[in-house]
Amino acid sequence: MTLPTDPAANLAALIRCASVTPAEGGALGALETMLKPLGFLVDRPVFSEDGTPDIENLYARRSGNGPHLMFAGHTDVVPVGDEAAWTHPPFAAEIANGEMYGRGAVDMKGGIACFVAAIARHVENNGGPKGSVSLLITGDEEGPAINGTVKLLEWAASRGEKWDASIVGEPTNPDTLGDMIKIGRRGSLSGSITVNGRQGHAAYPQLADNPVRGLMGLVDALLHPVFDKGTKDFQPTNLEVTSIDVGNPATNVIPAKATATFNIRFNDTWTAETVQAEIHNRLDQAAKRKKYRPGKKTPVDYDLVWRDRPSHVFLTRDDKLVDTLAGSIKAAVGKEPTLSTSGGTSDARFIKDYCPVVEFGLVGKTMHMVDERVALADLETLTRIYQRFIEDWFGQG
């Protein structure tokens, strides 16, 4: 029996599945075909929720006596954009100049392909890990992330699954393989502020109440002063205004409403609840000020709506997990990886509630771009890193 020990062949099979979120596109089926010869039992539960597409997921486990390691990731990919702009077709897995092209090559079908190859080599050389290995793979990471990892974890846990550690195979390296392990993530929270004014003629502002003026004062209060100066493990908390809309095409009309949307990435100085309280306090205080609304006697009339669910800040302090992975990276590429909490959120934010989790995968330079691609040499190196990690974490090195 031929085992899936070649990461490039594994990746090609996955790229050729057009699994643009939320479509499964055959990617989970291709993955199941790779895993079954390795002794994995595979389930593919489908989760639903009103107003969202049904999502197929995959949970596979190879059982043994000992600790339980989970590899997590996703097979769904972002849209390709203008397909004519691609040098090579986005779902053909063509190779040129030592690189494989295709949507999902680095984010993150490549990571999955390498982990499968690493397990296959370990089975071939050592008979398998002294413990259990599972793959928790969703088709809903690039989408709303409602019917994916969060529900798959709940589903598996309800069936008695427990994990001792997890690696998420997201592309964590900025420039070269081995640059960075993600050992935590900042929290994330989004909201919208709508200021209610009174529409009127721009030439007669005394007869109107310009909501844009009120909104300027509220936004200013969100941006100043800074929330903090950062901590030992995290960057400073940062708030970005991501949109401002008045829905007003006329230049001589004061609008009736103005809305600003914002996102805040917060460090371990805060919780989602304390960030929300701070923002409420800043807005309430700013609403009373007259700086942008001279002559107005009443506070700014505003509504604040929190959007989506917050992502909570976390930091993984599991020395065995972090040190074993860092040691595997150094053995393969000869350098110490940076331990970082930078960047955006990932599905690790859900996994951290079940077991210690870190993230490590390929180089992310071309993710989500036209001509997304990965060096074949990086696929081989990442496979060797994962294989060394599996051997050492299970005490078989």
Curated annotation (Swiss-Prot):
Keywords attached to this entry = Amino-acid biosynthesis, Cobalt, Diaminopimelate biosynthesis, Hydrolase, Lysine biosynthesis, Metal-binding, Zinc
Known pathway: Amino-acid biosynthesis; L-lysine biosynthesis via DAP pathway; LL-2,6-diaminopimelate from (S)-tetrahydrodipicolinate (succinylase route): step 3/3
Give the protein's biological function: Catalyzes the hydrolysis of N-succinyl-L,L-diaminopimelic acid (SDAP), forming succinate and LL-2,6-diaminopimelate (DAP), an intermediate involved in the bacterial biosynthesis of lysine and meso-diaminopimelic acid, an essential component of bacterial cell walls.
Which species is the source of this protein? Mesorhizobium japonicum (strain LMG 29417 / CECT 9101 / MAFF 303099) (Mesorhizobium loti (strain MAFF 303099))
User: What are the names of the required cofactors?
Assistant: Zn(2+); Co(2+)
Q: What is known about its subunit structure?
A: Homodimer.
Q: Which residues bind Zn(2+) 1?
A: 74, 107, 170
The SS bond pairs are none
Q: Which PROSITE patterns match?
A: ARGE_DAPE_CPG2_1 (PS00758), ARGE_DAPE_CPG2_2 (PS00759)
The protein's annotated catalytic reaction(s) are:
N-succinyl-(2S,6S)-2,6-diaminopimelate + H2O = (2S,6S)-2,6-diaminopimelate + succinate
| Listed name of the protein | Succinyl-diaminopimelate desuccinylase
Q: Which residues bind Zn(2+) 2?
A: 107, 142, 368
* Gene for this chain: dapE
Checking HAMAP family in the record gives: DapE (MF_01690)
Give the top-rank taxon of the lineage listed in the UniProt record for this protein: Bacteria
- Could you state one GO biological process linked to this protein? L-arginine biosynthetic process
CDD domains membership: M20_DapE_proteobac
Q: Where are the catalytic residues? A: 76, 141 (proton acceptor)
Quote the record's cofactor note: Binds 2 Zn(2+) or Co(2+) ions per subunit.
- Note the Gene3D superfamilies from the entry: 3.30.70.360, Zn peptidases
Look up the EC number in the record and give it: 3.5.1.18
Q: Name one GO molecular function term.
A: succinyl-diaminopimelate desuccinylase activity
